[in-house]
């Protein structure tokens, strides 16, 4: 369980790096990962998770903007923005239980972001989860 937490943390930090630079630089990400964990399994998983979520960031940002129009991604703290991107990707593309994904994102926001961030991250991710469930129940998307 701790490996998954460290993987999420490292993936969020890599995405934050890319977001701050306004570009995905895989060499910088690898160097950062190498400097932050000795575990090759965590490094590989974090890089894969960050790359996958980064590729979907525009679609995720559009969803988030509909959910929280007063706080579009461009106005969110960078840590929050990238935690939300990562968590929405994980909610949509993995079989990790939603409660685990949301709880981990809240804990990471508590550790790395502002005092208000845990409530904001929770609210956005809860709305995304409800939207996902509504789409499944409508038959718009299939549940795996």
Functional labels for PLM-detected ranges:
Residues 1-144:
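N-terminal interaction/assembly modules
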